Amino acid sequence: MEKMNVKPAEGKLGILVVGCGAVATTFMTGVFMTRKGLAKPVGSMTQYDKIRVGKGADKKYLHYKDIVPLADLNDIVFGTWDVYPQNAYQAAMYAEVLKEKDINPVREELEKVVPMKAAFDKNYAKRLDGDNVKDCKTRWEMVEALRQDIRDFKEKNGCARIVVIWAASTEIYVPVDMEIHGTLAALEAAMKADDRQHVAPSMCYAYAALTEGAPFIMGAPNTTVDIPAMWELAEKTKMPIAGKDFKTGQALVKSGFAPIIGTRCLGLNGWFSTNILGNRDGLVLDEPANFHTKEVSKLSTLETILKPEAQPDLYGHGNDEDTQYYHKVRINYYPPRNDNKEGWDNIDIFGWMGYPMQIKINFLCRDSILAAPLLLDLTLLSDLAARAGRFGIQRFLSFFLKAPMHDYTKGEEPVNHLYQQYTMLKNAIREMGGYEADEEID
């Protein structure tokens, strides 16, 4: 296979993180500590995973960086926006995800990461009360201010390239309105008209990033780039976009475990998932309007893996909700746990002759510890995609995301099956490295 024309990863890579909370500071601290040889980036596919290339006697297993030109960790420069003014060191200490002994060796580096004023609308995250916000009269002013931030950061830090990733709170749910979100022209008109109902602040970040030549990744379940207008902008600017919602704990388990049920042709009566979480993310999600955005994302995982219309005897009849399996997701704000999220899953299945069985999963995880490597992989791979000339929705990044983006206007279904997603990821790396894609995904 002819090798793709992938530009080398030369110069500094600026990673601008929207949000300087638990996830962002855990990510930054880990990168800084790894650069000093004081920690290992465990959980990062780009740093640890190996992909088979070639077949038979010619096969070999290589790290991603030995197949494609990835940015080096030493070339990363961090920037951030946040509604709170504390620098990354102060924010990391406040979050209490990491121990002081794992933060203090890179205190100097973290203290240099000072949040720029955020483009913020309290109506989209009512539980947040920070005052480090831009004084913008309209959504279009937000866009212009954010574009200037990106230009200034790039120039000040001598960055060759920029990637923008959202690690801020979940916004209230914004349903897709094709009159506003259907075309780029309509979205721009809404921004200039200050349509605050249909244009979320996150859309201003995405618009600013793409127009400044930076890939944009949506790490929350926000609608943001999951609209035709943003797909059009990504195509116009030739920039990659990815989303939605980092796949960390319960959704990771679900996307990996549901295929076991489906592959074994077992039936499903119901799947009940509940979580407790005490960090700032949990606080925001305690607001019903914000939780609904997350609920839509978390509920989407099962329906494309265990399809009622494909196996009505096992998963119910597609047009009759009364016969489909019952799927419920809940998140409860519980401050004593802070970032240490706990998830419970009760799965009611049935087997031979319809006899019932149950599966119980109890996952005591650390939300930011699971999320941090996703930020690293998504930013490095989005930068790679841009240098490879890939633009628009990056489906190969579905592996890292809870509600993978897809062109729903054409009836396309997302791939939520973890092992199919992994094959998509590997094949994209192979192709960008000049190797053949050689594994089936269905």
In which residue ranges do the predicted regions lie?
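Metallocofactor- and cofactor-centric catalytic cores in central/energy metabolism, strongly enriched
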Residues: 1-220, 224-236, 250-258, 356-442
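Short flexible/disordered coil segments
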Residues: 222-237, 276-287, 304-313, 334-343, ...
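Conserved anion/nucleotide-ligand pocket segment
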Residues: 242-244, 248-319
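Glycine-rich, aromatic-lined ligand/substrate-binding cores of catalytic
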Residues: 293, 297-393
